[in-house]
Amino acid sequence: MERNDIINFKALEKELQAALTADEKYKRENAAKLRAVEQRVASYEEFRGIVLASHLKPLERKDKMGGKRTVPWNCHTIQGRTFQDVATEISPEKAPLQPETSADFYRDWRRHLPSGPERYQALLQLGGPRLGCLFQTDVGFGLLGELLVALADHVGPADRAAVLGILCSLASTGRFTLNLSLLSRAERESCKGLFQKLQAMGNPRSVKEGLSWEEQGLEEQSGGLQEEERLLQELLELYQVD
């Protein structure tokens, strides 16, 4: 067997374990989100707290304060370092984002795409249809806001149509209205800012070179501008942007 053909089982085991951990975290937080909705929590902060604490287990009667502990109560915090801190130290070679499931996307989004520009390019690379398939059932807790922030911070005129397609696909995902209602104030502002940018990108084209709407309609391919504007108006309503 060639040296290059030797399978690195240790690396495969680590990758599998990381994938299983990410999948478990995704399912655990989703379950916590549903529990919080059923409990009719009073505020977004309370809802967020329930989900972020989903990995914690309730203390049993035998667990007494001051007693000798052989296992850390919060296994996700070891010597002042959290699981997320350890996970972000793993920095494999950059590769195109190719998630097969929403759990894959969630893992790669958090581990391999730390910066806004990287996240934005990954969203453009996947495109609206692919994102719609990945999140057909639901967008994970807190993820919708992060997606909107990445789009709002880096959208450019050349990407206007692609971003509209992404927003359209996200709006068709399961429990979209619920996830939209759970956006933080900052995320809502980013969402509003994103649509303001998209509107501004469309307006200059309507008076480009002094052309009338009829003349410009002939210049635009297949009425692309009119279609974008129609879609933008629909999305403004879906995302509840005034």
Curated annotation (Swiss-Prot):
Variant or mutagenesis effect after changing H154P: In CILD17; uncertain significance; hypomorphic variant; reduced cilia beat amplitude in homozygous nasal respiratory cells; does not fully rescue abnormal phenotype in a zebrafish animal model
GO BP terms in the entry: axonemal dynein complex assembly; cilium movement; determination of digestive tract left/right asymmetry; determination of left/right symmetry; epithelial cilium movement involved in determination of left/right asymmetry; epithelial cilium movement involved in extracellular fluid movement; heart looping; inner dynein arm assembly
Family: Belongs to the DNAAF19/PR46b family.
Any matching Pfam family: RPAP3_C
Location in the cell: Cytoplasm; Cell projection, Cilium, Flagellum
Top-level taxon: Eukaryota
Protein name per Swiss-Prot or TrEMBL: Dynein axonemal assembly factor 19
Species this chain originates from: Homo sapiens
Principal localisation: cytoplasm
Keywords per UniProt: Cell projection, Ciliopathy, Cilium, Cilium biogenesis/degradation, Coiled coil, Cytoplasm, Disease variant, Flagellum, Kartagener syndrome, Primary ciliary dyskinesia
Recorded coiled-coil stretches: 8-32
Associated disorder: Ciliary dyskinesia, primary, 17: A disorder characterized by abnormalities of motile cilia. Respiratory infections leading to chronic inflammation and bronchiectasis are recurrent, due to defects in the respiratory cilia; reduced fertility is often observed in male patients due to abnormalities of sperm tails. Half of the patients exhibit randomization of left-right body asymmetry and situs inversus, due to dysfunction of monocilia at the embryonic node. Primary ciliary dyskinesia associated with situs inversus is referred to as Kartagener syndrome.
Role according to the record: Dynein-attachment factor required for cilia motility.
A single GO cellular-component term on record: extracellular region
InterPro entries: CC103 (IPR042422), Dynein_attach_N (IPR031733), RPAP3-like_C (IPR025986)
GO molecular function, one term: protein homodimerization activity
Assembly information from the UniProt record: Homodimer.
Keyword Cytoplasm: yes
